[in-house]
Curated annotation (Swiss-Prot):
Enzyme Commission number(s) of this protein: 2.1.1.-
Organism, scientific name: Arabidopsis thaliana (Mouse-ear cress)
GO cellular component: cytosol; mediator complex; nucleolus; ribonucleoprotein complex
Protein name: rRNA 2'-O-methyltransferase fibrillarin 2
SMART domains: Fibrillarin (SM01206)
Length: 320
């Protein structure tokens, strides 16, 4: 067990041990668990090394407010107000700190140890929300970056390429709700295990452990979808998206792609890479509509959103 951090300047507070270490010269020292713990050494985390606190931090974890033990809730306790975001299915929890949240499809269950917030409704029932961390999810970073439309909304059918262990997929599953469906494709078996375990509890997630470069291999599992979200971080990711779109994305559907400049070409500036990728997408019947940077959450990443095989707009008759 990793010793929890104390907030008072010097070192770590130990677990439940007897004495712990008192710091040497450079280490702000560990302060002991239930008893001892000397003073932290000279140049630790704070200038003076600080004094080790006897008993470790309060039970609610290092920072959590008044939430359940171990994983504190939002700061501000019962004063959290949840408001709908302009993207349907996304909410903002306003407490001491504002956070992006989604309504938990499986109340009582966390997927990746994220914070959960329970809000009392007027009729006495409770609704549980899960905090959506933009540092762990490109889609949340794009929403906070001000993307105009993510096209993923309640009832939508989504094909998610590069699902990893299902962190973002779980929030997309919350977003589309019981009427929607998320086909989550992931090639790595290790991440796939977590993905499959998450999907056991979320009936609207269909995990597919397969290479997104070969959509023909899973064509029997996936129906036509409204949106493809792609986060594959491969040099040929535009091609991977186009292949999957040709099989599964309906005409007039939409795509959201997260582009990591470094994994395409690390020798040129990120902006140039994004420009080239957008051109590639345009050649494949995609119509990119907007691009947002994922700074400060991800470095040299951009998110591009647009339509696929969009119907031609009828030309308005010119007035004589």
């Amino acid at each position: 067990m990793r010793p929890p951090l104390t907030g008072s300047g010097g070192g770590f507070s130990g677990g439940r041990g007897r004495g712990g270490y008192s710091g040497g010269r450079g280490d702000g020292g560990f302060s002991g668990g239930r008893g001892g713990g000397g003073r932290g050494g000279g140049r630790g985390f704070s200038d003076r090394g600080g004094r080790g606190r006897g008993r470790g931090p309060p039970r609610g974890g290092a920072r959590g407010g008044r939430g359940p033990a171990g994983r504190g809730g939002m700061k501000g306790g019962s004063k959290v107000i949840v408001e709908p975001h302009r993207h349907a299915g996304v909410f903002i929890a306003k407490g001491k700190e504002d956070a992006l949240v989604t309504k938990n499809l499986v109340p009582g269950e966390a997927v990746y140890n994220e914070k959960r917030i329970s809000v009392q409704n007027e009729d006495g029932t409770k609704t549980e929300y899960r905090v959506w961390n933009p540092f762990r999810s490109k889609l949340a970073a794009a929403i906070l970056g001000g993307v105009d439309n993510i096209w993923i909304k309640p009832g939508a059918k989504v094909l998610y390429l590069g699902a990893a262990s299902g962190t973002t997929v779980s929030h997309v599953s919350d977003l589309v709700g019981p009427e929607g469906c998320v086909y989550a494709v992931e090639f790595s078996h290790r991440s796939g295990r977590d993905l499959v375990n998450m999907a056991k509890k979320r009936t609207n997630v269909i995990p597919i452990i397969e290479d997104a470069r070969h959509p023909a291999k899973y064509r029997m599992l996936v129906g036509m979808v409204d949106v493809i979200f792609s986060d594959v971080a491969q040099p040929d990711q535009a091609r991977i998206l186009a292949l999957n779109a040709s099989y599964f994305l309906k005409s007039g559907g939409h795509f959201v792609i997260s582009i990591k400049a470094n994994c395409i070409d690390s020798t040129v500036p990120a902006e140039a890479v994004f420009q080239t990728e957008v051109k590639k997408l345009q050649q494949e019947q995609f119509k990119p509509a907007e691009q947002v940077t994922l700074e400060p959450f991800e470095r040299d990443h951009a998110c591009v959103v647009g339509g696929y095989r969009m119907p031609k707009k009828p030309k308005a008759a010119t007035a004589a």
